[in-house]
């Protein structure tokens, strides 16, 4: 429980804040400066060699229900050590989260754990609460994809979002391909063996560790040289001097020799433009072009970058350099209307910014009660509101039964002068 909650404390208990990511889950209490635990979003079952990913969108509902029930039980009774019936829940989610996943998650929380209420909070919007700003262009570089969403005066501009399958998963796939093609392994029996002869594939955890420990993002000039050598642009196949090689210990006596050329070239897939001229940098610029022209200047000067992939060394510097480089191209120069771009520095690590925003919002107990889906409402209707559905009930039906709107909400919706 939070440190300031004693046995004799009165009032409502602080909410539980859960950021359920595809790779890692952040969990803790509202009002605190960081999550209590950051754990892989997997469960382990007897008889299965590989752990099961909890966040899956392409499995049947009952199987997903079973995975989520087991995983959330671990969160409550192994890490948080609190009674789920006593505390509201704030769930940080992506705006592109499939409806069946949201519905299954809320069914687990309401029907199995019997929580008092649930708030489904968009991760991009929660990130702004940590900075105290109303408008920003928010880019979330996560495990599966990079998703950009402009927010103006606290309202997400949903028709201007953009996404690309460029994230940690794409980096791991590229890293594994290059390791299997180029790297050698020293074992107790022999040295210089090819990696495929020692292991057919590299485990996900090893790829994650190699990426975090050895890989980095080059500056713009060096990155363009690496891309030119890779694709033989203008007959140029000479790449810049690579960084030093790294010896990475595998299980037992095996030593993997990670080439320096791999350490900086892997991350270039985030900035290489594909056949449609799309990259992480163009994602932001294309989203800006879709926004109303009178909002572009404010959005461009308030870039917020979140997600674990953006924590790679040199990522933010390279992203800003790429944007300033691309904005001079004819595609954007005549139509964008602004050239000034600035990136905010949130008060938390990029992978925890959305969680911290949820912890800030969850600490506002009066507002949280009026914005959450109550257990009584869910038991009566058996459904949750969805932004992409036109068949949603009025807002007043979702308030806690028998609880009046807080003064702030009364003032916001009052017509009295």
Swiss-Prot record:
InterPro entries in alphabetical order: Actin, ATPase_NBD
Record bears the keyword Cytoplasm: yes
Name of this chain's protein: Actin-related protein 10
Keywords assigned by UniProt, alphabetized: Cytoplasm, Cytoskeleton
Function: Part of the dynactin complex that activates the molecular motor dynein for ultra-processive transport along microtubules.
Similarity remark: Belongs to the actin family.
Primary subcellular site in the record, as a coarse category: cytoplasm
Binding partners and assembly: Subunit of dynactin, a multiprotein complex part of a tripartite complex with dynein and a adapter, such as BICDL1, BICD2 or HOOK3. The dynactin complex is built around ACTR1A/ACTB filament and consists of an actin-related filament composed of a shoulder domain, a pointed end and a barbed end. Its length is defined by its flexible shoulder domain. The soulder is composed of 2 DCTN1 subunits, 4 DCTN2 and 2 DCTN3. The 4 DCNT2 (via N-terminus) bind the ACTR1A filament and act as molecular rulers to determine the length. The pointed end is important for binding dynein-dynactin cargo adapters.
Single GO BP term: microtubule-based movement
Keyword Secreted included in the entry's annotation: no
Transmembrane segment boundaries: none
UniProt subcellular location: Cytoplasm, Cytoskeleton
GO cellular component, one term: cytoplasm
């Amino acid at each position: 429980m939070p440190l300031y909650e004693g046995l004799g404390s009165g009032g409502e208990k602080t909410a539980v804040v859960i950021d359920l990511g595809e790779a890692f889950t952040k969990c803790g209490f509202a009002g605190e400066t960081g999550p209590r635990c950051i754990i892989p979003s997997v469960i382990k079952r007897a008889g299965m060699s590989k752990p099961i990913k909890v966040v899956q969108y392409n499995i049947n509902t009952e199987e997903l229900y079973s995975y989520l029930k087991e995983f959330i039980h671990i969160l409550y009774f192994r890490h948080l050590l609190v009674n789920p019936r006593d505390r509201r829940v704030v769930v940080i989610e992506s705006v592109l989260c499939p409806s069946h996943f949201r519905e299954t998650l809320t069914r687990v929380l309401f029907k199995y754990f019997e929580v008092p209420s649930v708030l489904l909070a968009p991760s991009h919007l929660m990130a702004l609460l940590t900075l105290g700003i109303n408008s920003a262009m928010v880019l979330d570089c996560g495990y599966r994809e990079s998703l950009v969403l402009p927010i103006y005066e606290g309202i997400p501009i949903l028709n201007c979002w953009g996404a690309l399958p460029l994230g940690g998963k794409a980096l791991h796939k590229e890293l594994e391909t290059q390791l299997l093609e180029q790297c050698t392994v020293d074992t107790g029996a022999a040295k210089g063996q090819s990696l495929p002869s020692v292991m057919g594939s590299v485990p996900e955890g090893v790829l994650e560790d190699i990426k975090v420990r050895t890989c980095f993002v080059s500056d713009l000039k060096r990155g363009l040289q690496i891309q030119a050598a890779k694709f033989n642009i203008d007959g140029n196949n000479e790449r810049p001097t690579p960084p030093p090689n790294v010896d990475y210990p595998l299980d037992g006596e095996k030593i993997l020799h990670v080439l320096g050329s791999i350490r900086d070239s892997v991350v270039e897939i985030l900035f290489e433009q594909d056949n449609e001229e799309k990259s992480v940098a163009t994602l932001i610029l294309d989203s800006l072009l879709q926004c109303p022209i009178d909002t572009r200047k404010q959005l461009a000067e308030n870039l917020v970058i979140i997600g674990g992939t953006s924590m790679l060394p040199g990522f933010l510097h390279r992203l800003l350099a790429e944007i300033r480089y691309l904005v001079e191209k004819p595609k954007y120069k005549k139509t964008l209307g602004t050239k000034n771009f600035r990136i905010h520095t949130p008060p938390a690590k990029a992978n925890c910014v959305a969680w911290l925003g949820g912890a800030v919002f969850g600490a506002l107990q009066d507002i949280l009660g009026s914005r959450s889906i109550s257990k009584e409402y869910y038991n009566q209707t058996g459904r949750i509101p969805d932004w992409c559905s036109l068949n949603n009930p009025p807002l007043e039906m979702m308030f806690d039964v028998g609880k009046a709107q807080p003064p702030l909400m009364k003032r916001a919706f009052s017509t009295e002068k």
